[in-house]
Amino acid sequence: MPCNCFKSNVHVQEYKDLLVFGYASTIFPNDYQSEHIAEERHTVPCLGDPENRVDRYDCRLLLPSIDVAIKRNGSPSEQCPTEAMEEDMCEEERYLDMYKDIQREQEKEEEEKRRNDQRNAIGFDYGTGKVKARESDSEDEPFEPPEGIKFPVGLELPSNMKLHHIIEKTASFIVANGTQMEIVIKAKQRNNAEQFGFLEFDHRLNPFYKYLQKLIREKKYIPDLNKRPKKLTKTSRASTSKPAISSSLAAIAAAHGSDSEDSDSDYELHPSLLSGGAKRPVTPEKPGAIGPRKKPVEPEKPPDFTLKPVGDISQRNDVYAALFKNLAHVTRQAAGVEEVKMNVEEAKKEKENDHLDDPEYREWYENFYGRPCPWIGPRPMIPATPDLEPILNSYAEHVAQRGLEAEASLAAREDLQLHFMEPKSPYYSYYHHKVRMHQWRMYQPIEQNLSPLVLNSPAPPSAVSSPGPSSLMSLNLSTPEPPLNRRQRRRLLDSSRLDESITEPGVIDPITMLQIPKSVSTPANLDILKTPISFSLRNDEPRDESSFRFDPDLDETAGPSDTTANFSDISGLFPPPTPPVIPPSTQMQVDRKEKARIFMEKLLQEKKAKKLQEEEERSKLEEETRKKAEKISESLSERKNTGRSDRREEAPKGARSLDEIINNRINSLLSESGFEPVEEMKRTDEDRERKRHRKRSRSRRRSRSCSPRDRSREHKKSRKSGRHHRSRSRSSSRDRHRRNRSRSRDRRR
């Protein structure tokens, strides 16, 4: 009974937070629906078979025929090796996470075991193997000097190899990075004096450290930092305990294909459950098999055996060492000559291999620059960066339209910094490619409109040497080129203004467009051009607005019209091509930019004019004030010189008269406002003090001459007179205040 109570309490505690609630519902039979289902009126015939009726949502209704569902192929299908391999790969990918999780858990268990049983772990042994004695650790190994180095007598050496490795590594680091790093290491390792105490000057190993540092700096000793001290690792322990494994365990491991020979875990999974445990047999693949193929197994290369000398022969003092030292200089000279020859040959090969052999490029270079090409072809093309691409494209188009002189004028301007026009630039070949591309686009419509006579005649050199679509469409030109910013457009306009003298705008000569070679230009070969050529100049015709306007500052209405030529009488020559046309939107943008520039210049000029006007006004005011000051100073100096004596006499009177006028004016204002003048009050106070002083002096004189009774009488009289005087002064001040108040009231009214 108590057990049941305990169990019930436990269940109550488990489901204490669980809450179940619901609502009451009324269930009633649906006679119509039940009758409908009982009579199977909700079913439909399956694929036209009235006897076989199914629900209208049955999936068998989707089949074209019922025979497809009934028909079954009893014969097993042949298994293809590629399909089997695909299935194995799918299975491996399907359960890859499970295998990885198992491996992760196994690694965690091994780490926990290693931590808990690190000191007490003893490998299992059947007693058949030989137990080797444990090797001494490298930390306790005594110091052994490196091969080929003799330390001076009296130099104190480190006690073990561990300390020697620390000193060696520190010395090589200081030699490589400078002596300042020694201060940094000393500051960081100030608490580790046991290992880095040799950095102190008074330490016993500091001379050894300095001597080792000197050897490394002079390259007499090169330490092998990759060489690690010998430590007793798990692999070495496992190798020592390999003979202790019995033959039965080796047979079991070989049968199951286990790869872990030195595993100490007793709780491993069966090898068949591991991902890499079971090795599949290697089956030869068929040559016509379709599907994934296995990676071919590469044969292992045998290790390279290199024989190293036991010691440095140059450090010996015998006969062979002397012979070696004498022959070392000769061998070094021969090796140096061979290295120089090899370097020269490699440089020549690199220069030859750097440029690609392209005869079309050489022909175009010779026709464009007028000199033979110094290379066999262009360098490998490196596309420009996104920020350089629009600038390079715009200048390449400008050079393609204007020619070599435009390129020379642009390259001479250092403010533009057009480094891609230099042959040393990595984008030089890409720049030439863009120039050829724009030339080909320019001459393509001309070639399409040529007459048969002109097509039979030799073509212009630029058209012949211009690249065709086969050689120029290697790059993706479908993407639109980004527009130029304000600074780039301004630079392009400035460069076009500088080059206006090169080609006159609006004048097109068909003979120069054809560029007849010298062999054709002789009089004997010019039978085609015997017919007369008539030219007509039209000055009254309006200028064609669709043509490209090179200078936006020119007025469209002013100036004579362009020179035109009538080629109606020429037989065999095509009409002159139209000038390059730019869209109206671009022309409007250029006009707006020019108007904005003119407007900004006007604003700047107005500001400058205002500043100049303000400066002039300031200078005028300064001049006037300076002149007034000079006049005043002159008048004062004259007065001082002429009437210095008269001024001394009249100055106090004039000053007194001015002071009296000012004081009277102030007193009148104060009296009008209802206040007593300050000066009058001061004067009355002074007068009173004087009177009192006089009375006291008189009373003293009398007291000296009179008796004590007379003195008392005089004292009483003076008291009475003082009281009377005070009462009179009070009454007079009251009357004065009343008068002032009445005056102020009258003024307000």
Swiss-Prot record:
<dbReference type="InterPro" id="IPR040397">
    <property type="entry name" value="SWAP"/>
</dbReference>
<feature type="region of interest" description="Dry CEEERYL">
    <location>
        <begin position="8"/>
        <end position="124"/>
    </location>
</feature>
<dbReference type="InterPro" id="IPR000061">
    <property type="entry name" value="Surp"/>
</dbReference>
<keyword id="KW-0508">mRNA splicing</keyword>
<dbReference type="GO" id="GO:0000395">
    <property type="term" value="P:mRNA 5'-splice site recognition"/>
</dbReference>
<dbReference type="Pfam" id="PF01805">
    <property type="entry name" value="Surp"/>
</dbReference>
<keyword id="KW-0694">RNA-binding</keyword>
<protein>
    <recommendedName>
        <fullName>Protein SWAP</fullName>
    </recommendedName>
</protein>
<feature type="compositionally biased region" description="Basic and acidic residues">
    <location>
        <begin position="538"/>
        <end position="552"/>
    </location>
</feature>
<feature type="compositionally biased region" description="Basic and acidic residues">
    <location>
        <begin position="608"/>
        <end position="659"/>
    </location>
</feature>
<feature type="region of interest" description="Disordered">
    <location>
        <begin position="537"/>
        <end position="592"/>
    </location>
</feature>
<feature type="region of interest" description="Disordered">
    <location>
        <begin position="458"/>
        <end position="498"/>
    </location>
</feature>
<dbReference type="Pfam" id="PF09750">
    <property type="entry name" value="DRY_EERY"/>
</dbReference>
<keyword id="KW-0507">mRNA processing</keyword>
<feature type="repeat" description="SURP motif 2">
    <location>
        <begin position="391"/>
        <end position="431"/>
    </location>
</feature>
<feature type="repeat" description="SURP motif 1">
    <location>
        <begin position="166"/>
        <end position="209"/>
    </location>
</feature>
<feature type="compositionally biased region" description="Low complexity">
    <location>
        <begin position="458"/>
        <end position="478"/>
    </location>
</feature>
<dbReference type="InterPro" id="IPR035967">
    <property type="entry name" value="SWAP/Surp_sf"/>
</dbReference>
<feature type="compositionally biased region" description="Basic and acidic residues">
    <location>
        <begin position="679"/>
        <end position="689"/>
    </location>
</feature>
<feature type="compositionally biased region" description="Basic and acidic residues">
    <location>
        <begin position="105"/>
        <end position="118"/>
    </location>
</feature>
<dbReference type="InterPro" id="IPR019147">
    <property type="entry name" value="SWAP_N_domain"/>
</dbReference>
<feature type="region of interest" description="Disordered">
    <location>
        <begin position="105"/>
        <end position="149"/>
    </location>
</feature>
<feature type="compositionally biased region" description="Basic residues">
    <location>
        <begin position="690"/>
        <end position="704"/>
    </location>
</feature>
<comment type="function">
    <text>It is a regulator of pre-mRNA splicing (and, possibly, of other RNA processing events). It may regulate its own expression at the level of RNA processing.</text>
</comment>
<feature type="compositionally biased region" description="Basic residues">
    <location>
        <begin position="714"/>
        <end position="749"/>
    </location>
</feature>
<feature type="region of interest" description="Disordered">
    <location>
        <begin position="256"/>
        <end position="310"/>
    </location>
</feature>
<keyword id="KW-0804">Transcription</keyword>
<dbReference type="GO" id="GO:0003723">
    <property type="term" value="F:RNA binding"/>
</dbReference>
<feature type="compositionally biased region" description="Polar residues">
    <location>
        <begin position="560"/>
        <end position="569"/>
    </location>
</feature>
<feature type="region of interest" description="Disordered">
    <location>
        <begin position="608"/>
        <end position="749"/>
    </location>
</feature>
<keyword id="KW-0805">Transcription regulation</keyword>
<feature type="compositionally biased region" description="Pro residues">
    <location>
        <begin position="574"/>
        <end position="583"/>
    </location>
</feature>
<keyword id="KW-0677">Repeat</keyword>
